[in-house]
Amino acid sequence: MAAKESGEKLVALNKKARHLYEFLEKYEAGLVLMGSEVKSLRLGRISFKDGYVKFQDGEAFMIGVHIAPYENAGYAGHEPERPRKLLLHAAEINAMRVKVEQKGLTVVPVRVYFKNGRAKVEIALARGKKVFDRRDDLKSRDLDRDAARELARH
């Protein structure tokens, strides 16, 4: 048997979420996966395209995240966009659910990684950015980049 991995190994980052949402709180959750999904994740074959977290019967599920089928899975493959259960404490689930219902926030996946050999997802309680907020972010990023370029020249 192979030695256990230590530390974190990043699988994928949801860059679009950072652009579309303002993150208020972040949580780490475990993922309930099938074997072929774990193997596919290790190859980095995941897309967050329209991913979000839905609360149902006191549990949290990640919806709309595409994990590509593992080629060597044979008959034991998985459905690419099935809802995946998140492993969180009940208090965390209830706190997020209340904020989503009352304040009109949403919960989105931010990144997927392996921590000590186990698949984890970082989810964030987020508020959607308005178009002008996104423009302001782009402007400030451009100004920072220009300033750094000028400093490097001199």
Swiss-Prot record:
Assigned keywords, A-Z: Cytoplasm, RNA-binding
Cellular component terms (Gene Ontology): cytosol
Coiled-coil ranges from the UniProt annotation: none
Domain of life: Bacteria
NCBIfam families: PRK05422.1, smpB
Protein family: Belongs to the SmpB family.
This protein's name: SsrA-binding protein
Organism field: Solidesulfovibrio magneticus (strain ATCC 700980 / DSM 13731 / RS-1)
